Every structure is written in structure tokens, then in C-alpha cells.
Amino acid sequence: MKCVLGVETSCDETAVALYDGERGLLAHRVYSQIAIHAEYGGVVPELASRDHIRKILPLIKAALDDAALSKENIDGIAYTKGPGLIGALMVGASVAKSLAYAWRVPVVGVHHMEAHLMALQLEESRPAYPFIALLVSGGHTMLVHVEQPGRYKILGESVDDAAGEAFDKTAKLLGLPYPGGPALARLAEQGEPKRFIFPRPMVNQPHLNFSFSGLKTHAVNCFKQYGGEEQTRADIACAFENAVVDTLIIKCLRALEKTGINTLVLVGGVAANKKLRERLGQVAVKRAAQIYYPRQEFCTDNGAMVAYTGWLRLNAGEKEDKIIRVKPRWSMAELNIIN
């Protein structure tokens, strides 16, 4: 299997990419639906699905043009099978399987979280296996022991709101535009870090699970007590971000200590957070640990990570039939080891 087309439509980004086993990433295109969902303050699933339908085929054509390839050069197709929004997933699955049937090439469904874990394999500097991954993407926050591709052990995960969800909900409370996470991080830069001190949830417990819903409640209480003046909003944002970042770092260090592994990987949309990257980098230097994270464009949802993961699984002999199936909920424990 040489050249694989990757299709990503799990939420509000329509993304495609072409990955070649010999030449690497040949092209990738991403169309964001931020402008569509901004007026609603969050993703509207029906609108997301409809916009994927409009954008997916033109994006595939654009990626093929970027790489100076045609359909005859495609050896396989990968698409995001789950987890995600069911309607959005169905668009990507339908297009991928239809093209695979028309072009007579194999097709495979990819786990969205596994694709995030594999994003670093697109970089020149890659971690050696095994490593610990902090995966913070949308509705997921988890610490994963990655022994090899396809062999994963979940060490801890969010028991209520994930970090990304807590960022978005707190941003909405503060009257910030969608997408809330980046807007909150920008506002936090103007905040006074010592005015409010939020709790660091579950850090005194021995397990590696996360809970961020209490931080959102804490922000609500501060907002009600001190009002919505601009500086107060910035101070609340700063306190919230510091609490989330500290909690993630404490749990990461505990995971490294428990496993004896000294390599940490940071992936997913929240991995683009500037403060989290800076603080983890500082901690890694003190601990003499190795830390890796992908470039910003590969932190958020993209087709490149899907194309690469699909390339791995297709070359391991995996392929699917013509029936269109998606998995809006899909545990990583169900994945096969890639040999």
C-alpha cells in the first residue's frame, strides 16, 4: 500500500490529506466551519453535516491537484469512523466508501483518538515506543500508555467534563466567542494570576482520572460574586486556565512515575494551548524527560493523521466491506494491534 487518501469529518472540520509511504505527506487541506457555528455559540450537528456534504468533494479534488495526482494514483482510502457526531461521520464514511468502490481500492475506518496519537509520526522528530500520551481533544481527556501502534492502555480519563469542554463552557459563561478555548486563553493572558485561586481537582487522589466540571462551577460563582467587568473576566480566565494546566501536568508527572516511562506526548486540540506547552516544557527540563507535540495544524482535527493511521492499518491487512457503518462511541480498547 503506497498512497492513501484520508478523510476527516468527525465534528466541525472537513479535512482531507494524501499520505505516501515513501514520500510522506503529499497534501492536506482543512476547511473549518467556525463561521457557521459561531452565531450559535457551539457546533450544531445538522449544520455540520450539511456543510461537510458541500465541502468534501471539492477538498479532495484540491488535495489531488496540490499533489499533482489523479484517482489512478490512490491505493487506498481511510476515513474517520468514530467517535464523533453521527451525521458528520456518515458523510465522511459515505464519500470514502463510494470512492473506494468506484476506484476499486480498499477502504478502512480509523479511530479519531488513535489518529491523534499517530499525528506525531508525521513530524521529523518522533517519539520512540513506548510513551505516555496526554490526549486532550474535544470531549476527551485521557492519559494513554502507548506500547506500540494499536496497543493502548488507558491510565486515566475524564469522569465528567473533558478539559476542552470545560474551556468552551467557561468561555461561553464569560461571553467569549466560539471557539471558546482559544478565546479564553487569549483573555487569560491579560489576567492577574494571584487574584483568584481555583482548586486543582482530584490531584490528591492516587488515580489518574480527571474532573473539570467543578472548575466551571467555580468560575460561575466568581462571576456572580464579582461581576463581569473586563479585568475580572480576564482574572477568572487566568485562574481557570492555570488550574486546568496545573491539573494536567500533575497527572502527567504521576503517569510517568507510575509507569517508569520518561517520554511524554501531548496531542489533540488543547495541545495547541500555549501555556500548557510552555509549562510542560519547563517541567520536562527539570525532570530530564522527553516531551513531544505536533505542530499546531496537526493538534486540531486534520486529514493527515487519518491518512497516516489508515496507511498503517491498510498495510497491516485491514479493510472493510461496502456497508456504511460509523461508531459515534468507540472505545480504543476495541482496536486491533498493528503488526
From Swiss-Prot:
The keyword Cytoplasm applies. InterPro entries: ATPase_NBD (IPR043129), Gcp-like_dom (IPR000905), KAE1/TsaD (IPR017861), Peptidase_M22_CS (IPR017860), TsaD (IPR022450). Its cofactor is Fe(2+). Substrate binds at L135, V136, S137, G138, G139, D168, G181, N273. PROSITE patterns: GLYCOPROTEASE. One of its GO terms (molecular function) is N(6)-L-threonylcarbamoyladenine synthase activity. Keywords: Acyltransferase, Cytoplasm, Iron, Metal-binding, Transferase, tRNA processing. Its EC number is 2.3.1.234. It catalyses: L-threonylcarbamoyladenylate + adenosine(37) in tRNA = N(6)-L-threonylcarbamoyladenosine(37) in tRNA + AMP + H(+). It comes from the Bacteria. GO terms for cellular component: cytoplasm. It is found in: Cytoplasm. Fe cation binds at H112, H116, D301. The keyword Ion transport does not apply. Binds 1 Fe(2+) ion per subunit. One of its GO terms (biological process) is tRNA threonylcarbamoyladenosine modification. Required for the formation of a threonylcarbamoyl group on adenosine at position 37 (t(6)A37) in tRNAs that read codons beginning with adenine. Is involved in the transfer of the threonylcarbamoyl moiety of threonylcarbamoyl-AMP (TC-AMP) to the N6 group of A37, together with TsaE and TsaB. TsaD likely plays a direct catalytic role in this reaction. Belongs to the KAE1 / TsaD family. HAMAP family: TsaD. This is tRNA N6-adenosine threonylcarbamoyltransferase.
